[in-house]
Amino acid sequence: MTSVVKRIATGSSVLAVLPANEDPVEFPGDYFLQNPGKIRVCINRKLDVATLRQYVYEGLKNGDVHVCHINSYLYQVLKDTRDEAQSDWISFGVSLAVKGGIVSVFDTLMIEDYRGEAPDGRKCDGRTIDDDKWLPMLILGLYRVSRATQEDYKKSLLQKLYAQCKLRSPQAEELVEDAAEFYEVWSNDSNFLKLVAAIDMFFHKFKNHADAGLRWGTIVSRFKDCAALATLSHVQKVTGLSIKEVFTWVLNKSVEDELCRMMKERQEVDKADSYMPYLIDFGISTKSPYSSVKNPCFHFWGQLTALLVHSHRAKNARVPEDIPYNELTTAAWLFAYAMGRSSGLEQRFTTDDSYYQEDEDINKGLGVKAPTTRDVQMWLAWWSDIGKVPTQDMETFARREVLGLTEIRSKTIGEYAKKTFSV
């Protein structure tokens, strides 16, 4: 939309524009309109699993395994993993299974031959089929470890990964050192990411499968770069409101715009067995419309609201840059205060036909007294009556909520709230 202003001195029109410095978001539905069918992945299928097992083992041990061998090994070892579909499985018009049919772990993919050069690996003696019980867990678990950003947490994850491997086979070995980083480059390989996503998508669908424990490593692929969606779900849970009621508490245009974009129809956001949660690793989208980066105002508003209604995890959410902090803070503050001053308590059962019903007029004509319901209209009327300036009780409420915050990280919602409300 173009914006035109008038220059007072001359009466001439001036076009007001900003530089287009951001790439547009890419929705999963648009991808499948342009690329109908299953996700394509390229795998080198020339080597047998016995040779690949040796290459992968020695490569992990020495820190020089080639991702092409990793992909081929995962494919060869897991391709026969199957389960029975309890219903038709369709996503974005792609038929993945029919009710009663047998579906395999990579049936979400269209497997094509890898045409690039595959270097030789290093062979070794003593590798057996028993290694196939734990090596895939180690490989997939390293993907999860590579996503960690804090060193202590990374080391902790690696130890937990080894425990998972030993559960699958007592012969599992700790091949990778704490300081190793060679496996982090696997995330640059689109074929590896697609295999990870396909594995997680399958075991999310078939949660009771004997090998569903492999999700320990792949689970971070699901809803990657969808932090804003997670924020929406979190706000709904911690406030106790329905999703519709949460929407009514959106008071800022910037939040409104971002939320409406996220709610674009026919994207299968609410379909659990869809391709959608894996839009990044499947290569469906390079700019997620559900990330905190693309929805900074909504993410900030939601996380600050959650923090002020006792959410411990919200304190570590990152504070976005270059957003209207003041108006977003006020909106989140009022929302949280309303939740803290009211409740959804009602009599839910009765022994006969009689039960307590609140007088509908109880909150009318309150003047400057805060409402006791969660009705946004009553709260906005009250907010207008008090001059749209936070009351002393609101300040006390916010100060009390941030008083006990400890172990606060830099540039987080916790730090922002502490500085804003503790004065």
Curated annotation (Swiss-Prot):
The keyword Ribonucleoprotein is assigned to this record: yes
InterPro entries xrefs: Rhabdo_ncapsid (IPR000448), Rhabdovirus_ncapsid_C (IPR023331), Rhabdovirus_ncapsid_N (IPR023330), Rhabdovirus_nucleoprotein-like (IPR035961)
Major subcellular location class: virion
Region described as Interaction with the phosphoprotein: spans on this chain: 351-391
A single GO cellular-component term on record: ribonucleoprotein complex
Residues annotated as binding RNA: 144, 153, 207, 215, 287, 318, 409
Keywords, comma-separated and alphabetical: Capsid protein, Helical capsid protein, Host cytoplasm, Ribonucleoprotein, RNA-binding, Viral nucleoprotein, Virion
Localization, UniProt: Virion; Host cytoplasm
Record-linked Gene3D superfamilies: Nucleoprotein, Rhabdovirus nucleocapsid protein like domain
SUPFAM superfamilies per record: Rhabdovirus nucleoprotein-like
Subunit architecture: Homomultimerizes to form the nucleocapsid. Binds to viral genomic RNA; this interaction contributes to the virion assembly. N in the nucleocapsid interacts (via C-terminus) with the P protein (via C-terminus); this interaction allows to package the L polymerase in the virion and positions the polymerase on the template, since P acts as a bridge between N and L. N(0) interacts with the P protein; this interaction prevents the uncontrolled aggregation of N(0). Interacts with the matrix protein (inner layer); this interaction contributes to the virion assembly. Interacts with the L polymerase.
Family: Belongs to the vesiculovirus nucleocapsid protein family.
Role of this protein: Encapsidates the genome in a ratio of one N per nine ribonucleotides, protecting it from nucleases. The encapsidated genomic RNA is termed the NC and serves as template for transcription and replication. The nucleocapsid is bullet-shaped with the tip containing 8 turns of a conical spiral before reaching the helical cylindrical trunk. Nucleocapsid assembly is concomitant with replication, therefore viral replication depends on the intracellular concentration of free N, termed N(0). All replicative products are resistant to nucleases.
Full protein name: Nucleoprotein
Organism whose genome encodes this protein: Isfahan virus
Gene assigned in the entry: N
